[in-house]
A protein has these predicted regions:
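Low-complexity, Gly/Pro
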Residues: 1-153
Length: 153
């Protein structure tokens, strides 16, 4: 019977550690959601390794809401909407974008992201493909690599 007490104590410690880790992840998600929130202008865009002209990239804005909803606008017209799931505890940080409106409705793209000062970099794989491991876009990997700057209100 004495063996049960140490085992129970070990389980209690393990459960407490898992809860603390979950709390840390929730806190990190909340912090990054706050960073994501707002309107962002694309300043650099590469698709399949092809860099878009700066003036074309700057026609695109992304509006992120605190709850993870987002919209992509081109010259002020919404071309896609969706939801996002982020995990800022991963290295690199991960994002899953699910399209709810637009050409790719119902599809999910896996990606990675990082923040700079008033900027963020995102690299996304085509829907159904593996998550990028690094921030790169080539003809072979088919990734979209974008740098966005926060727009001032």
């Amino acid at each position: 019977m004495r063996l049960h007490a140490p085992l129970g104590f070990a389980l209690l410690i393990a459960m407490t550690s898992l809860t603390a880790a979950g709390d840390d992840k929730d806190k990190a998600i909340k912090e990054d959601r706050k960073k994501y929130e707002g309107t962002w202008q694309v300043v650099s865009l590469e698709v399949n390794g092809n860099k878009s002209a700066e003036e074309d990239a700057k026609k695109i804005t992304v509006v992120n809401e605190a709850d993870g909803k987002w919209a992509i606008e081109v010259e002020g017209k919404v071309v896609a909407r969706g939801t996002s799931e982020i995990d800022p505890t991963k290295k690199p940080k991960t994002v899953d974008l699910t399209m709810t409106e637009g050409e790719d409705k119902g599809k999910t793209s896996l990606g990675i992201y990082e923040f700079g000062e008033d900027s963020r970099k995102v690299c996304l794989a085509p829907a159904g493909k593996a998550r990028p491991a690094e921030f790169s876009s080539t003809a072979a990997n088919g990734h979209v690599l974008a740098v966005l700057k926060r727009m001032k209100k």
